[in-house]
Curated annotation (Swiss-Prot):
It comes from the Bacteria. It is found in: Cytoplasm. One of its GO terms (cellular component) is cytoplasm. It holds the Pfam family DUF2129. The lineage of its organism: Bacteria, Bacillati, Bacillota, Bacilli, Bacillales. Keywords: Cytoplasm. Belongs to the UPF0298 family. This is UPF0298 protein OB1449. Its main location: cytoplasm.
Amino acid sequence: MRVNRQGIIVWFQHMKNIKQLRKHGNVIYASKTKRYAVIYVNQDEMDDVELKIINYPFVSKVERSQKPFVRTDYENAKPDKAKQYDYKMGI
């Protein structure tokens, strides 16, 4: 069974506090220079985890990822005619 997950972008002041974020979800990426981390969390626990994370003193800002809500099926996608011709020739 697949669980719907969503990313949280956490902006912080010090890199050493990343260990505390690991208990709330999967830390996918952490940037040392820009001081942010991307954490994946179950969508049904999203509100609770976001409130817990924003209450940490080292966190400056929390943003939700909009990736699950972006449409990825395109209606007006036109195929390349040259590629179709090559596939029909059997090259």
